[in-house]
Structure formats: structure tokens, C-alpha cells
Amino acid sequence: MNADMKWLDDPEVFRVNQLDAHSDHCYYIDYADMEKSENPLMQSLNGQWEFAFSKNVMDRPENFYEENFDASSFAKIMVPGHIELAGYDKIRYINTMYPWEGKEYHRGAYSMESTGDEAGMFSEAEYNPVGSYIKRFDLSEQMREKKICICFEGVEEAMYLWLNGQFVGYAEDSFTPSEFDLTPFIREKGNVLAVQVHKMSTAAFLEDQDFFRFFGIFRNVTLKAVPEVHLEDVWLQPTLNKDNVSGRVSVKIKVTAPEGRKVAAHFVLKDRENNQVAEDNITLEEKDGSRVGVIDTEVGSVKAWDNHCPYLYHAYVELRSEDGEILEIIPYDIGFRRLEMIDKVIYLNGKRLVITGVNRHEWSAKTGRSISMDEMTADIDCMIRNNINAVRTCHYPDQIPWYYLCDKAGIYVMAETNMESHGTFQKLGAIEPSCSVPCSIPQWREAVVDRARSNFETFKNHTAILFWSLGNESYAGDDIEAMNTYFKEKQDGRFVHYESSFYDRNYEETISDVESRMYAKPYEVEEYLNNNPKKPYILCEYMHDMGNSMGGLGTYMKLIDKYEMYHGGFIWDFIDQALLVKDEVTGKEVLRYGGDFDDKPSDYEFSGNGIVFADRKEKPAMQEVRYYYGLYR
């Protein structure tokens, strides 16, 4: 198969040769390797890559992936990182408009009778920048003679991949991992990996989030050596029983192994002090070319997990040979909790759930959405310090470590799928859905369901996730309904959230378990709750913290005591989106917001809505948050 630039124009092509999404577990050959700082089965490709920038598809170095290609004219670029912050293209912040507004007329393929398939919209566009990356590497000794996969944790927005001159695959969805099998093309030494990243494709219609419009390889790139016997996927479902003192855990695994090879699977659960509290053998059966196993194990005495006491247990799945030799170990920390809705009120472990939350973009003043572990840890510490107990991952899945940090800290998560098509149905503030995407357009359905699938499969084991969110501000329709159906069929005990059913009440019963609103005034919340409400109420965005804001927070907080069905909400938002740059006059570093980069179209200072500045210093508004949220601590 050869790469086809026309895939950029086709909403029905969003992944080619990409491996199926699976749980975000780590795996090790034995317990000794598990204690090492670096996993010998992993090899990072982060660092310096060769790079060339082109203004569009026609100007790209077409054969740059060939092994004998002369890349002497290529520059150097650091991965992970945004291409714009390396000095290429234009830094641009936009809220709801698309980058082409006012310059080119685009409507989503099949969104209107007159549009058709929109062939050439992006593949032949005068402006659609391309980044061509080359990475040369040798396999580490521990990785050799094994199946090798590569994982791109985040590439914005569409990527083509080659290895040693051979086409490997294509992927969209900027914010979930894209994995490919490199085994047919890889060698021990002298590998040439080539990645071509396109700033816009049909995925652009689904990624109209309120943020700076960057592109490039902005998250980690890792080679993974896959053992001959390998746990491909694990789904751990711990549940706190009704008595609040005992629990059970369901374990579902998918294992790959050579035909005829006998493999045993064993589950072990230990507490914080490393005392074993449960164990069970997992019987494996052949299914669709893999081996699958399921157990449901009772645990006699457990400590419940919640925001006040985020107690985690150490779970292990061991794969062993016929004679008992350990072949692979998968560790995962899990917590026991019970989430339920009784009489339209949500309860966690038998207590009414109160959300004192915040929306959080991933952001660094120096590196944009390519953030560090230290910055993530600082955000968790800030939330705990200021009585914030929940986070909405607006409006895309975050880096994998963020979910582990939330598990450990007891921060409740509304895990949002990477989808926002705001600019297709709201124009200059008016709701006008005549060309809304994805809506009920069949050609877009599988693309958005795949985004839901990637979100679920990757993060399904995280105790902190209480809600799956279908996305943000993408109107309503059969395609959104199909996403909801996907989550519901999983029956994982979590609730599904979506706000934009508010715009089309025909779908309010089929695309959200909660009544969700943005910026509804307190009296509007009361109007809903006083008039035969159908669902519990959550403000997925409120208290827009732009400028000297947050003064009315106390009025909203009073509703928590007044109405059982009101569960609180998520402040907009956690951190300003601004970049540290050197001032041309003073030479000092200053924070610059949307519009400060001569970017047009732009929504200017609207990028600054945080309760912390972009350098993570707390704003005065945080005093209000700490006080009022603290009343419900």
C-alpha cells in the first residue's frame, strides 16, 4: 500500500494500518525489571530529529522517506514539541472559528447537499503546512529479535509514517496514542524513520477547540518491544460492595502467544503495605486469534477510594509458562469505589457526589501543550491546595501520566473525547447548524465513534474517571448518539456526559446521563430543578475567569445545599493560555496572549481565563475558589 494525500480530504479515512487502541498498562519481563528506572523493553525516540517545513502538500519533499534521500538541507527540531514554537509557520489563537475563516471557504464534506466529498480541500490547499521529520536510530540490544511497535502519544493533526523507505500507516486524532507495527520493516541498525505531519485534514473540523492552533509531534515517541507471550489488553473493574467494607474485582485480559504455546495467567492484589489480599487464576480461551480470560474475584475487606482518601491497591497480572516461569508482568494501581444514580441523584460510595471542579487545558508558557511531568504534578498540588476535587480534560484526552496522578491524588475526572466542531454550527455567536459536523452524516460517524473508542480503551482502568464526555460543543445528531451507544454498551458503571444536547432536545434522552449546561445563571439552574427535572444537573463550564472574575461563585455554591440533584460544576478554566516570549524593547520575558502574534483571525485575550497565570502563579480569584470550594471539602 502507498500513502495517498487524498486521505486528508476524506472523513472516512482516519486510520490506516494503525493498531487497535488498548489499555495504557506497562509491561515487564520480570519483577526485577519492574524496579528499574527504565524499562528495557522501551526505547525513547524523543530528542533531536531532522526537519523540513513546507507551506503545503505540493511543496513538501515528496520522497524524503526514501533511504537514499539527501536530507542535508533539513534543519534540526526537538521532539516532542510544536512546529510553530520552533520558529515555523504562524502562532495563532482562535476560540470557535477555523484557521481558514476569512481566507478560504470550507464546509465539512457531505455537510450540505452542495458540498459533496470536497476533494482537494486540504490536499490541494494553498495553505496547509507540512512538517517532514526524519529520525535515524539503532535498536537497543534488549529490543532485538522481538516484535517492535512504535507509539506516538500525540501528533497534531494528521500523520503519515514510513520506515526504511516502506509505508507503514496513517493516523488522525491528535490527542490519543497512535501505534503501528514496525516488525516487517525494522532492522537492528541503521533505521530511517520518516513522519510527515499535516496541519489540517478533515480532522480539523472535529478539533475546533478553544486553543492555540499548533501542529507537530508534541508528545512522546516510543519504540516498544513486544514479548512472544504478551498481554495485549487488560480491563480491571474494582467495585465497592453495598456494605462499604468489602469489594470485588473483575479482570478481563487479552493475550497473544504462539500457536500451541501453553500459557497460564494469574491475578494478584496487594494493599499499600504489600500484603496480599486476593489472588485468582485466569483461565484462557481462544477467541478471534487471541486468548482471552475473565475472572470476578471477591475481596473480603477493602478501603474505599474517594477524594478524601484515595486508597489504591497494587494489582498484578502474571503470565507464566507451563513450568511456572514468569514470562510477563503487568502492574496497575486500582481503587475500590461504587458509583450509582438513585432517584436522579449521583452517589459515590453511598454519599452524594459534590463536584468542586475545574476545566484544564494542558499548557506550558514555554512549550505550549507539550507539558512536563513536573508541570502536571504542580497542577495536582495546586488543585489539592485549593480544594479542587475534579477536573474536566477539556476538550481532549490528556497525557497518560495525568490520569495516574489523578488516581493517586483522588481528583475526579470527566474524561473528554477529542471532539469539538463549534465553528460548524455557531457563527458569530448565533446557532446555525445547517452545515454542522458530524451531526447525522453517515460518512463522519465511524471517525467520531473511533475517537470515543480510543478514549475508552486507553483509559478504562483509571479509578479517577467517573464520567466519559462525548466531546464539547459539537451540536447533536445520530453520530453523537452513536458515541453514547458505544460507551453504554461497555457497561463500565460510569456516567456519560454531553452538554450540547441542550441545543437539540430530540437527543436529550440518548446522549447524556446528566443535564449539563455552560454558563447558566443560578436562576436558570433553579428553573430546571424546580420544574420536574429529568436528570441530575452539572455545570460543565461556569464562572468564566477572565479578568477580575469569580465574584459570584458563592451564589452557585448555595445551590449545592438547596438542591440534591445539583452536583456542582467545573470552573472555566484552570490555566491561562499565554506564551513566554522576549520583549523586543526591554529584552525581558513577558507573557503574550492571543492576538499578540499578529495572528488573524484571533480571539485575542480570550485565551486568558485561568485561575492561575500561564506561569502557574495563582491569581487573586483563587482565594474565592479556595474559600467556597473548601466549604464542601
Predicted regions and their residues:
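Substrate-binding clefts and catalytic carboxylate motifs of secreted carbohydrate-active enzymes
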Residues: 37-61, 78, 84-86, 128, ...
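Active-site region of glycoside hydrolase catalytic domains
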Residues: 232-240, 247-250, 328, 382-385, ...
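Short glycine/proline/serine/threonine-rich loop/turn segments at secondary-structure transition edges
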Residues: 143-146, 186-190, 299-312
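Accessory carbohydrate-binding/adhesion or oligomerization-edge regions at the termini
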Residues: 1-111, 192, 196, 272, ...
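Active-site-adjacent substrate/metal-binding segments within catalytic domains
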Residues: 81-139, 143-151, 157-162, 169, ...
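Accessory beta-strand-rich segments of carbohydrate-active enzymes
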Residues: 3-20, 35-36, 50-54, 82-86, ...
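Surface beta-strand/loop "capping" patches
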Residues: 228-259, 624-633
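Beta-strand-rich binding/interaction modules
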Residues: 161-163, 246-284, 293
